Amino acid sequence: MTTQTSTGDRLVHQEIIGSRRLSNYLWAIIVTMGGIGFLLSGISSYLKVNLLIVADPTQLNFLPQGIAMSFYGLLGTIYGIFLWLTVIWDLGGGYNDFNQESGQIMIFRRGFPGKNRKVEFNCTTENVQSIKVDIKEGLNPRRAIYLCLKDRRQIPLTRVGQPLALSKLENEAAQLAKFLQVPLEGL
């Protein structure tokens, strides 16, 4: 989450990185290449024609090795296509806008194509009760900033994925609480 403050400190705009992260690009490349490699190995064992550069799968028996390689290759290719689509659609990406001049807060995220492709949440700054920091350590750590509203709703403001560093999380939460002039909870 990156923060840019502009217009005389009356507007805070935070970009949220969605699925267009380096790790997602790397996993999409690896899974797609592996899936296509397995699929070509299975097809090569059936046709007895080498379709790969790095190996000779024509020596494999089609039953059962070739069929298994084709099946896993098909699954890997489909999963690779899914990963590429999530990167192209930038799932989870968006921004948080906090505007003191108009008294409005807008949280925007991108979703899957269709009726709910754009997820928008709007509220007034007067409806904000506090900013909450949620820190859970352990095997599956969670570090998130929430916008707590007076009607008891908690709206997540941080991205999903790799947890933020503690110092960065605390600084961003403190800056946001100071900007909105609300208390900071959870520290």
Swiss-Prot record:
UniProt keywords, alphabetically: Membrane, Photosynthesis, Thylakoid, Transmembrane, Transmembrane helix
TM regions (residue ranges): 25-45, 69-89
- Membrane topology term: Multi-pass membrane protein
Could you tell me where this protein is found in the cell? Cellular thylakoid membrane
One Pfam short name:
Ycf4
Q: What is its main location?
A: membrane
Tell me the GO BP annotations in alphabetical order. photosynthesis
A cellular component annotation (GO) from this entry:
plasma membrane-derived thylakoid membrane
Role, per record: Seems to be required for the assembly of the photosystem I complex.
Which NCBIfam families does the entry mention? PRK02542.1
What is the similarity comment for this entry? Belongs to the Ycf4 family.
Q: What name does this protein carry?
A: Photosystem I assembly protein Ycf4
